[in-house]
Amino acid sequence: MKTYIRKIKDEVCNLNSNQLLQLDQAIRHWLKGLDDIIPKLIADMHTETKANQFDLVTNVDQMIQDQFDAFLKEHYPSHELFAEEKNNDLVDAKHGDVWIMDPIDGTANLVKQKTDYCIILSYFSEGQPMLAYIYDYPHHTLYKAIRDEGAFENEVRMPKVPSLDISEMILSYNPYVLNEHTQADLKAAAFSYRLIGACGLDSLRVMKGQFGAHINTNAKPWDISAQFLFAKELDLKMTNLDNEPIDFAVGGPFIISNKGCHEAVLEILNQKGGYQVNKITKT
């Protein structure tokens, strides 16, 4: 059995283009199967509080994650799952074949609004992003990125985002973690400000050229795992708030942005006290 699993793992770690596309097809089929499951879960939704009153989890989150875990065990037994609603202490996200999942990104939106939430799922092979998905379930829109193949919205190729100045762009950030001076400077420099409250959906607006940047000062690995590959394929910038690479297995303060406003946003964030990492966030 160990030899068999190791053989599967070796084959998947060395995926060629056709094999990666086959894996993508299997994952898309699994994601679309949620269309029959999620309405029933929402109809009987139970909510619990985790770290604070804004940090919620529901049976919807847990069931989606459990079903994907079962899918991996059945079809890709050598793959590991690194996910929000489980203990990840024994998972080495940087080696082998690892899926990173946020079963519901924007749980508070699901609970309070029944919209503006998504599923984030990404596949890393030996620490390299290979496949990425953001499923905007309420709008039945599946965004995906395939390494070296591009990014797609419901299988239609997404164009790379043109470089634009900060003055032309809407910025997305949580005002509760920025001091008043920083907020004022960002608002003065940008065209406007918005916040959806789901990291995946706020990031999608950047990917589609609707926002200039999305800033999150407390991102977990599952909040941002898909964004790495989307940023690569769409010619965007994704760094920490010191303009350095992000450790995908750790997370932390991050920005995904249009190349034309990346440095301008970071300059403002790092002046006058800037952001405060440890404040409770209402997102």
Language-model features, listed with the residues they occupy:
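DPxDG-like acidic metal-binding loop motif
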Residues: 93-149
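Short, solvent-exposed loop/turn motifs
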Residues: 129, 157-159, 245
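Residue-level signal for inorganic ion chemistry
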Residues: 34-38, 61, 72, 81, ...
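Acidic active-site catalytic centers that drive phospho-/nucleotidyl reactions
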Residues: 61, 84, 102-105, 136, ...
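ATP-dependent small-molecule kinase catalytic core of the GHMP/sugar-kinase superfamily
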Residues: 137-167
